[in-house]
Design a protein with these regions (language model features):
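N-terminal substrate-binding region of glycoside hydrolase catalytic domains
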Residues: 14-99, 103-143, 147-152, 158-160, ...
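Short carbohydrate-recognition loop motifs
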Residues: 166-189
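Extra-cytoplasmic beta-strand recognition segments
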Residues: 139-153, 178-184, 194-220, 244-252, ...
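Aromatic-rich peripheral "rim/lid" segments of glycoside hydrolase catalytic domains that contact
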Residues: 86, 128-139, 278-289, 324-325, ...
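Beta-strand acidic-aromatic groove motif in beta-rich domains, primarily in extracellular
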Residues: 189-195, 218-230, 257-262
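C-terminal outer-membrane/trafficking sorting elements
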Residues: 562-611
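Extracellular beta-strand ligand-recognition surfaces/modules
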Residues: 226, 245-276, 312
């Protein structure tokens, strides 16, 4: 049946096309957006997620349209993690979160929250300050010098920003010390910055007094940082036109700290004679275990309440706890223990840095139970809470990490109050050239889905991405995108197809949450995550790859076959172009090209044509 229909040509966006200038990719031009292949009659709860770089989503229209067009759910890569929203003093800034949630939900996307409780990317400066020993209130305050520098004799500074670019210079005087000549008012205070002191030995969590003898040609503020390149405290140091000894208190976050000064927003001269750090010599009293617990419940309450208020009820599902299970240890029942700051040779990726292990202080059960209680207290009434972890498809230990996680969920829920709704499996995996390795990982992916289904919990593939490994070495290096062959790209596409279909085959409809493709595009060579690997469904220029077709086949259960074999009418006039129902003109222009298109309805010569 054909019906007359007028169509306005609309150019396809680049993310709707395969790589230009290569006939191996032309078939990808004809596919619809990924989400159009979801069969909601069979899988009404399924959500197709895309890992999202939030700053890119908010600033790059091509990237934003790619996410909005292809996915039904968006997951922030980092923007909703604690360290992205909370500074070293516990101040919370959710402005980016609010803008992201509003933009995505107005585009019709479901926003999945990632993550409420974790040990990595935490505001550890703030948390460590909260747990710091308290000075003995019965003792008299007494300070002792820790470090000092007199610029009248020590005429040097450490690393500094470019003087010519930012319009400043430094000189030294035997009477006035360091003189900073600022001739340009810059956009940012940190445009002019320099290390005044380095390698200051401090005790983390302890408060120190800094005294600076300083003046300026006009009154102003020096901006400061005591810490390292990742963490620190940032008080301002006010000065006038007269010499003054200015005192500022700092709480040490980093044991071996530098002292940085910034004055990019000041025009004039700043004079600094000397700087001195002093520490309180009074005996400190550590918090009791009960005080530490209550302090962290306060911090967790403030964090979760703030995030839930920022999301305004729009984010209805969360990774409650991320990466809790260690890949080692014994919990006394033959399962792996929880991750902690010490004791696991292979279970912890990132001790130090911004890591803070809540369970070290709160206990393995209380940590998760408190997070769950607060999420349900402040979140929407219908909130769903997941435990998310990696290596749940582990073939080297027969899925022991997943079995351990399922056992830990039973422990957390044993109080009769805590309820975990679902399990998220990250699936940062590889496709293997070696058949033995490939079959082994596929066997344990199948077993993973079976175990998750048996748990009765909602099942979500939360961060799926894939590399490619050649040779027989199970732990061999992944092939870089630039070195991949067409056959290897297509083998990865087949692997994606198989995983998606295996999810639908093994996870009951009522337990399906969905699958999130963590890396939508290939990883740049300088990325800290699988740098230079072919992990995306689009390349770095936003063109579709063969893996896109693998996802389509997986979602669609293979190509539809109901009208397979029906031949095109040879009289069909394709000279005026072939269009999709949304009015976008396809690159196909011949009858043979129409024959090669995916099955569906198209507009040809002003009529609807079933192919």
């Amino acid at each position: 049946m054909a019906a007359s229909l007028s169509a306005t040509a609309m150019a396809q966006e680049k993310f709707e096309l395969g790589k230009p200038g290569d006939d191996n990719y032309r078939y990808l031009d004809e596919y619809q957006a990924l989400k159009e292949y979801i069969d909601y009659e069979k899988y009404p709860n399924f959500k197709l997620g895309g890992g999202t770089t939030v700053n890119e989503y908010l600033s790059n229209p091509v990237y934003r349209n790619m996410i909005n067009s292809n996915f039904t759910e968006t997951v922030a890569g980092n923007a909703m993690k604690m360290s992205s929203c909370v500074d070293a003093n516990g101040n919370m800034n959710f402005s980016t979160v609010k803008k992201y949630v509003q933009t995505a939900t107005e585009a019709g996307l479901n926003v999945y929250g990632h993550t409420l409780a974790w040990h990595s990317q935490q505001a550890n400066g703030w948390l460590l300050k909260l747990l710091a020993d308290r000075p003995d209130p019965s003792a008299e305050v007494e300070f002792a010098e820790i470090a000092s520098k007199d610029f009248r004799s020590a005429q040097n500074i450490g690393w500094h920003s470019d003087e010519a670019q930012y319009g400043y210079s430094v000189e030294y005087d035997k009477n006035d010390g360091l003189i900073v000549h600022c001739t340009k008012k810059n956009t940012n205070s940190w445009d002019v910055q320099f290390l005044a002191m380095e390698n200051i030995a401090l005790e983390e969590g302890k408060t120190y007094k800094m005294t600076m003898t300083v003046k300026g040609t006009t009154a102003g503020n020096l901006h400061s940082k005591l810490g390292d390149w990742n963490n620190g405290q940032y008080p301002n140091i006010p000065f006038t036109t007269e010499w003054q000894d200015v005192e500022v208190s700092y709480k040490a976050i980093v044991a071996n700290s530098f002292f940085m000064l910034q004055c990019g927003d000041f025009v004039g001269d700043i004079y600094i004679k000397n700087i001195k750090f002093e520490g309180d010599k009074r005996k400190s009293i550590p918090l009791t275990a009960e005080e530490r617990h209550d302090t962290l419940v306060y911090a967790m309450d403030k964090w979760i309440k703030g995030m839930m208020e920022a999301c305004d009820g729009r984010v209805k599902a969360w990774d409650l706890v991320n990466e809790a299970i260690a890949g080692d240890g014994n919990d006394g029942e033959g399962n792996y223990e929880l991750q902690h700051s010490e004791g696991y040779k292979s279970g912890t990726w990132d001790v130090g840095g911004s890591a803070f292990y809540w369970q070290d202080y709160m206990g393995d059960l209380e940590y998760v139970r408190q997070a769950c209680r607060l999420a349900r207290k402040y979140g929407p009434e219908d909130i769903k809470l997941f435990i998310n972890d990696y290596n749940l498809e582990s073939d080297w230990d027969n899925n022991k990490k997943l079995k351990s996680l399922i056992n830990w969920i039973k422990k957390w829920e044993a109080d009769g109050v805590t309820k975990i709704d679902g399990i998220g499996t990250q699936m940062h995996i590889s496709c293997f050239e070696n058949a033995t390795n490939q079959n082994k990982i596929k066997k344990h992916i199948t077993q993973m889905f079976q175990l998750m289904a048996q748990s009765g919990k909602l099942v979500r593939v939360s961060e799926m991405d894939m590399g490619y490994v050649r040779g027989s070495n199970r732990w061999g290096s992944s092939v870089k995108t630039s070195d991949m062959t067409e056959a290897e790209h297509k083998k990865m596409a087949d692997m994606y197809e198989w995983i998606v279909q295996e999810y639908f085959r093994l996870i009951p409809v009522e337990q399906q949450w969905g699958i999130c493709q963590w890396c939508t595009t290939d990883s740049p060579s300088n990325s800290g995550w699988r740098g230079g690997e072919p992990v995306g469904l689009w390349d770095l220029d936003y063109y579709r790859k063969h893996t896109y077709a693998g996802w389509v086949r997986g979602l669609n259960g293979g190509e539809p076959t109901a009208i397979e074999g029906v031949e095109a009418d040879k009289a069909t006039n394709t000279s005026k172009g072939i269009y999709r129902l949304d009015g976008k003109r396809l690159s196909a222009t011949s009858l043979d090209a129409l024959e090669a298109l995916p099955h569906g309805i198209y507009i040809v010569d002003g009529k609807k044509v079933i192919k």
